């Protein structure tokens, strides 16, 4: 910088020039010319003002800029300096950057130049603010001083580590040590004053520290042993809470006082206190007291209080035989929920003999007995109605002609596959003989007898023997029992009617005996015809014969020894019970007949004949069943042929008509056979020599048509062709 001596020298030179003669002075034009030559020769470095009338050296410009900055308080805008000095902004900015690069006491940022004096003033002002408030954020300081955060950081905050600053810079906040110490003491006071579990977020908000400074203060207190409590959960969790020791003491006192006063503890209260877990409760009460508690859904209670609850319900139950658990427990004034009351009701039902619990009521078995007694007359009326219905259905079944049975599986009419053995569940058959076509075993009609819950509820409501509150419960418990009782009454009535009909048993026995003989004659006739077919067809037909006609013979024999023609109505279990109750001389032969039906050995028919012979011996039924001779077989065959002819005349269903046609041709040829639809394809191949060629062709066409219609039920063209072929077949084989 220019010294005072230089200034004095310039002043003396100026005075000397002013005192010289005019001839020795330079005119303004000469001065300008001289300066231009000096500038052109780079002898001097100057900067012109904006109007071009003045100039200043760069060194002097630096001095002017520094003076302007200091005059503005240490902070001046480059734009304001350019206006004040009347110099272009670019020269001002360039010179300012040169100043900053050479002088550490100045800095530039955002088109502003700052002097060290300004930084000192900011530091003093910051110290004052911190002394007043204890902390300041950089955002607030930036707004207060109109500085950018980066500039504030570089000018002030980064230089606060000196010994004259007693504080901490944490992130974007500046704290004084005294402020942090005061906040730590506030935290200590809060932690000591708390008596309940409090979220850490609430405590932190009250202390007024950032999470980082809060946990630093917390750890400082913890290291000093000044934390009278524990943390619940992770520090980083939003649900982290503080549990003071005083809270544990108060909770324990509260739980113990409630337990001693009430003899129960509500789980909702324990949850609020944070001791709902069994280990925590055991720690509060002690192991011995905890073992005395009865755990329920909404509370823990002592065994003595549970006994009081049970006794209250028992006393109410003894009065009327019915107890509303909720009302019975009201006198104890306990906050029980429905699940607790149900548990107590179940305990009472287990303790009280012949008691039941349902829908909040405990009631004695006598209530059920009285309810049944009140509807006994209604059950009697219903039983007679059911007996009449069963008799009507039985007569309807017995009066209807047995329909011709046709195999329903789609592969039964196939192209020559081996026929399945007789007696399959879904196999249907056609067999000749006027008496040999008895219906197969039907389901026991009495199994359909029942009383639905709606009807039972109406009966009980009308009888007024059951309180409305437990009516639905009684209905549910008695539903099966009333059905069983009704069936027993029906059986008793049927048994009574059976005894009344014993007078007509002789005629019935004679008819059943004739039926047995006719069935056995048909069986022998069919068996003889099966021997004309080669195996495996012959063996399959014999097995089928055994499962169908043989089964009917066995049922007829059982009906004969029972004296009532209803063996076909019995289920297998009932049939076995009936056989078991027969006298020994009848039981073993009848059982042997049924056992032979299940045999699949080659000698199954021989076993069946032996069993039938033993059953018809004088020591058993005295029916004297025997194999029919050739003349007898011819008579039976004629009857079968006549019946098949009659059925063919009335039959219109194509599949059944085809089966009847095949059986009719075989019967006319002296080979009467019983078979189902699955044997049709094999039997057609066997009768090629028994009928004219055109009939055989029609049989094959019909057989293919039946298969096509079964597989393609919507094919109307195939159905029409089949109907035409069946019509032609009937006309061809019937005279």
UniProtKB/Swiss-Prot annotation:
Superkingdom of this protein's organism? Eukaryota
Q: What segments bear the compositional bias annotation Basic residues?
A: 419-428
Q: Keyword Transferase: yes or no?
A: yes
Q: Could you tell me which residues belong to the region Disordered?
A: 389-445
Alphabetical keyword list: Transferase, Ubl conjugation pathway
Write one Gene Ontology MF term. UFM1 transferase activity
Instruction: State the protein's name.
Output: E3 UFM1-protein ligase 1 homolog
The source organism is: Caenorhabditis elegans
